[in-house]
Amino acid sequence: MATAVTTRLEDKYVTIDGLRVRYIEQGAGPVALFLHGASLGSSADVFADNIARFADAGFRAMAFDIPGFGLSDTPAQQTVKAQRDSIPKFIDAAGLGKVALMAHSRSGGFAVELALAEPHRYSHIVVLGSGNLLPPQDEGQAARHQEAQQRADQMMAEKEPTLEDTRKLLQADTFNHALITEERLKVRNSRSVGQNFRNHVARQSAPQGGGSATAKPLWQRLTELKMPLMMIYGREDRAHAAERVALLKRQHPEMNIHIVPNCKHLVPWDAADEVLRLSVPFLRS
């Protein structure tokens, strides 16, 4: 079982569209760029331990705060499209060239969309717990899951979270609660209050369109990707993830998909060892 590794990485910045965008990095070698999700408190800090592990394995491991999250500046428009488009803009601003994307939660959909549109920019895609890339079990399930997520986001927008509120949110997304160290808890809470909380509230009323240029669900387009794809999910993740992974695997037995036991939605934490073990040979292929 994964154990938390305490790291402190230097905050660095690039400028994107006039916004100061913060990132963290460690190591040298091929670039593995970690992308955080959209929940309240999400930031590059989610991957601090993963970055240290991948750096030790011979990669230049990086993560950045999407504008409107973490320590990055707040954009005038906090749309889904703007969040997605910040990824190639960051890659260009940091002068990274071709990169592998390690995408958690909603950013998994971003990674697939970007890779479909500009395949020459991305060497590999690793998806970590992205429910938006799994087929529904029945016709109405996708809509129900989206409504449930919207309700959860709206509830989190009702009041600024206390430290204990943040602990409960993390406990809901992790199987191994011992991974929620006091340091991780304080960092997550600090990324959930003040301007970050106001940004979260603003995102609830921002236009949510523009995430995909086609009406075809992304899970139906995974086989169109021109680069290697690997998907890792937690067996205990929400929204029937394990059953939907099994459904996708039955439809496409050739796909590189893994289910990790004793793991919920925070795959980078619960499955840190497995993510490293599976990803290193995959990224070197």
What are these regions (language model features)?
Residues 1-34, 56-59, 96-97, 284-285:
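Alpha/beta-hydrolase fold catalytic core
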Residues 19-71:
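Conserved HGGG/HGGXW glycine-rich cap/lid loop of the alpha/beta-hydrolase fold
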Residues 48, 56, 63-102, 106, ...:
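Active-site loop/oxyanion-hole signature of alpha/beta-hydrolase fold enzymes
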Residues 112, 116, 125-162, 168:
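Flexible "cap/lid" loop of the alpha/beta hydrolase fold
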Residues 159-223:
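Conserved alpha/beta-hydrolase catalytic His-Asp/Glu region
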Residues 225, 231-233:
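Short beta-strand/loop motif that positions the catalytic acidic residue
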Residues 235-240:
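Acidic catalytic loop of the alpha/beta-hydrolase fold
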Residues 253-285:
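Catalytic active-site module of serine/aspartate enzymes centered on a nucleophile-bearing elbow/loop
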